[in-house]
Curated annotation (Swiss-Prot):
PANTHER family linked: PHOSPHOGLUCOMUTASE (ALPHA-D-GLUCOSE-1,6-BISPHOSPHATE-DEPENDENT), PHOSPHOHEXOSE MUTASE
EC number of this enzyme: 5.4.2.10
Nucleus recorded as keyword: no
PTM: Activated by phosphorylation.
Positions contributing to Mg(2+) binding: 101, 239, 241, 243
Protein name: Phosphoglucosamine mutase
Function: Catalyzes the conversion of glucosamine-6-phosphate to glucosamine-1-phosphate.
Stated family: Belongs to the phosphohexose mutase family.
Organism: Francisella tularensis subsp. holarctica (strain LVS)
Phosphoserine modifications at: 101
Gene3D superfamilies: Alpha-D-Glucose-1,6-Bisphosphate, subunit A, domain 3, Alpha-D-phosphohexomutase, C-terminal domain
Active site, UniProt feature: 101 (phosphoserine intermediate)
Lineage: Bacteria, Pseudomonadati, Pseudomonadota, Gammaproteobacteria, Thiotrichales
């Protein structure tokens, strides 16, 4: 079991968890030392979101890297997918993002990309963790690394997207965008300006403390309200580091990551094509049934965009994602990318002249009830055996009307209890039953 890494990097409350100046410096030094051991290029890229803690954590990371003899190129405040993109483009050994994604501003963390733009696999994470717990290493003969700032990183990213999609995007509707006061602030607007989109921007004034507060992809009520007030045709909401996207239609109705994947699957020729779709254990059964009916291969991965990516590579598919809004298209990038996904959707909406609501899967979706149960410590999968008989009882009662999923969070001491059924009250009642059993046996 990983000591520091969760499903999406390392994350926690600043100064009251792993996320301290001392740890972040050791992490930088550990990765730098590993780069030296493996004879990778002595050069990495770093970026950050808008949290007030991002600056001093970044410089702690840089100092550890520099001490190990690694040169650092700082992109400043940029979306997470921009760091992955630039890591590949500039042939860096690794890319770091100081971010806690959709979490509150008091949290922060580090996402780490390898030279191919993918998040680290479990084996490499274990190597990094072993190095963190070892000695701090200074590069011999004072051959320390350098530190430089690249101010135009977002321009390179925007130009790459524009060169691929300029001929497809001609969207005439009115768009509202919610940047979550995060890394997309001003950067997403620059991308939309490049494509000539008519938009209104909200939650795009970061002050270091307001990231994700009452806005962004985890608070869709903000974008729903704005779409109605602006009488807009489309709403696009990103999270704090812009690797997630949720959209709403002209009626203010939400289309989550599953719904977005379904739209991309229908128009995959515009998005570069794919032989199938990768969803997750959380993907609504209605979409799985829809893909099957339309002879579109569909695979469920474990929850976490790194696992979606692993299955995309394993099965040779190009498009996949999560209900939460992480959407990956390997025809362009290597990680969840809210900005690029938005442009793909605008390209699709430009080609088919109908309201956004008509792109959604028609009919009622299976009803999901998801309850997060706080725990005193992280729960291992083997701990779930304590409630296995209770889960089995619920599955028997549901029969073919639904399913059950218990999933430990990869980033916090929380157990997610999800029940899906063709009736909302049935899903809710069974989920609440399981929550009580979890509280009795695991809390």
């Amino acid at each position: 079991m990983a000591k520091y890494f969760g499903t999406d990097g390392i994350r926690g409350e600043v100064a009251n968890s792993t996320i301290t100046v001392e740890f972040t410096q050791k992490l930088g030094n550990a990765v730098g030392s590993l780069i030296n051991q493996k004879n990778y290029p002595k050069f990495v890229i770093v970026g950050q979101d808008t949290r007030s803690s991002g600056g001093f954590l970044k410089f702690a990371l840089v100092s550890g890297l520099n001490a190990a003899g690694i040169d650092v190129l700082d992109l400043g405040v940029v979306p997470t997918p921009v760091v992955a993109f630039m890591t590949v483009k500039h042939r860096a050994a690794a890319g770091f993002v100081i971010t806690a994604s959709h979490n509150k501003f008091t949290d922060n963390g580090i996402k780490l990309f390898s030279s191919n733009g993918f998040k680290l696999d479990d084996a490499l994470e274990e190597e990094v963790e072993d190095m963190i717990d070892g000695d701090f290493i200074y590069q011999p003969q004072f051959k320390f690394g350098s530190y430089k700032i690249l101010a135009n990183a977002i321009d390179e990213y925007i130009e790459s997207i524009h060169s691929r999609f300029a001929k497809f995007v001609n969207y005439k509707g009115k768009v509202v965008v919610d940047c979550a006061h995060g890394a997309a602030s001003h950067n997403f607007e620059a991308l939309l300006d490049k494509f000539g989109i008519n938009y209104v921007s909200i939650a795009s004034n970061p002050d270091g403390l307001n990231i994700n507060v009452g806005c962004g992809a985890t608070c869709v009520s903000n974008i729903k309200k704005a779409v109605k007030e602006q009488k807009a045709d489309l709403g696009i909401s990103l999270d704090g580091d812009a690797d997630r996207i949720i959209i709403v239609d002209e009626n203010g109705q939400e289309i989550d990551g599953d719904g977005i994947l379904n739209i991309l699957a229908q128009y995959s020729d515009i998005c570069g094509g794919t032989n199938g779709i990768v969803g997750t254990q959380m993907t609504n059964m209605s979409y799985e049934n829809h893909y099957r009916a339309n002879k579109i291969p569909f695979i469920r991965s474990k929850v976490g965009d790194r696992y979606v990516l692993e299955d995309l590579v394993k099965y040779g598919y190009k498009i996949g994602g999560e209900s939460s809004g992480h959407v990956i298209n390997l025809n362009f990038g290597t990680t969840g990318d809210g900005l690029f996904t938005a442009i793909q959707l605008l390209a699709i909406f430009s080609q088919a002249y109908k309201p956004v609501s008509e792109f959604k899967l028609q009919g009622e979706l299976m009803q999901q009830t998801l309850i997060n149960v706080p725990l005193t410590k992280k729960v291992a999968r083997e701990d779930l055996q304590k409630v296995a008989s209770d889960v089995n009882d619920v599955e028997k009662r549901l029969g073919n009307r639904g399913r059950v999923l218990l999933r430990p969070s990869g980033t916090e001491p929380v157990l997610r209890v999800m029940v899906e059924a063709d009736d909302k009250s049935l899903a809710t009642n069974e989920a609440e039953y399981l929550v009580e059993k979890v509280k009795q046996k695991l809390v």
